Regions:
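Short internal beta-strands
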Residues: 44-47, 154-161
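Histidine-anchored nucleotide/phosphate-binding helix
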Residues: 31-36, 140-150
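Short, glycine/acidic-enriched loop or turn micro-motifs at the edges of active sites
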Residues: 10-11, 51
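Acidic/histidine-rich helix-loop elements
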Residues: 14-22
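Conserved N-terminal glycine/acidic-rich loop preference
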Residues: 103-141, 163-185
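A short helix->loop->beta-strand "cap" motif at the edges of active sites that frequently abuts
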Residues: 39-41, 150-154
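Active-site alpha/beta core segments
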Residues: 28-127
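Extreme N-terminal starter segment of soluble prokaryotic enzymes
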Residues: 1-4
């Protein structure tokens, strides 16, 4: 079975407070990837999630941009992506780490809940693929955590379904991931 992890495809990262043209451009690619998933693919989403104390966190001090506040429009998974999954629901997770069905919320760049799931359930997968936003922050954090949790697992990142904070940061991060034996396509 394949695991497809879609990182932080949320409104604030696409066309909201931290949105970009590059992020908007990958939405159709991610939708297509979801639509093409079959019954042998488990799709998991992550959602960057912040609360009223964001300004007091290290991230809030270093990135003082209001984004992905819990239960706001900017926090929601982009509608094209959530609708694609509703139209093609692959497998549904019943796991306490996943608060909202196949979605895990996270308050940091990398998700320890996702890694706990991989440590427990990784033996059920033949491969893991990652895509989403932002390549140079949350995607790379989760990919390298997965590499540490499952050192012998084939892991792929689809670069056509990722966007970074800048094109240069995106490309540099893809190079780093290749160095860590991640298959970048």
């Amino acid at each position: 079975m394949k695991l497809l992890v879609i990182i932080d495809m949320q409104n604030d990262f696409i066309d909201g407070s931290l949105g970009s043209d590059a992020a908007k451009a990958i939405v159709p690619n991610v939708v297509k990837k979801i639509e093409e998933a079959d019954k042998n693919t488990l799709i998991i989403f992550t959602q960057d999630t912040h609360f009223s104390d964001y300004d007091d966190t290290l991230e809030g001090k270093l990135l003082p941009v209001y984004h992905c506040r819990y239960n706001t429009e900017g926090w929601m998974i982009h509608s094209d992506i959530s609708e694609a999954w509703v139209d093609n629901p692959t497998n549904v997770i019943h796991d306490p780490e996943f608060i909202y069905g196949n979605t895990v919320i996270k308050t940091t760049f990398g998700s320890t809940h996702l890694m706990n799931f991989l440590i427990r359930e990784g033996h059920n997968f033949d491969e893991i693929e990652f895509c989403g936003l932002c390549t140079d922050i949350c995607v790379v954090s989760n990919v390298l955590m997965a590499r540490a949790a499952l050192p012998d697992m084939p892991i792929t990142v689809d670069s056509s379904c990722c966007a970074g904070t800048t094109p240069e940061a995106h490309n540099a991060t893809l190079t780093v991931m290749r160095s860590c034996q991640i298959n970048v396509i």
